Amino acid sequence: MIRGIGIDIVHVGRIRHWSTVPGLVERFFHPAEIEAAVSRGSSKDLSLAARFAAKEAFGKACGTGLAEMKLKDIYVRNERSGRPVIILEGTAEKRFAELGGGIIHCSLTHEGENAVAMVLIEDTQST
């Protein structure tokens, strides 16, 4: 059963600006996300924009926003196939468990200067 759906869009210029403010990228992104984005070269900001959109979409899918969660405790990594997977640590893992947990599905895309993420949370309890 679907427990929640969230979607978000982020303009890449927002992330480009954050890159000029010391410590801001590190505040919002997990080190693994930053490393993966840097490895993408000129697509770095687009990669981070998609990942930030995923964090926001996850909060919306939870139905609570990102209250009580640190953004860097929610991160996206890609499987070998390229499929994005949301990983939770620390505050995000704890809060998600308090909300009942579930299976998290994520899709990322981009067009021009915009990155979009959709997150679906599937209930693991049968009804």
Question: Where are each of the predicted segments found?
Answer:
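Core catalytic alpha/beta fold that binds nucleotide/phospho-ligands
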Residues: M1-T127
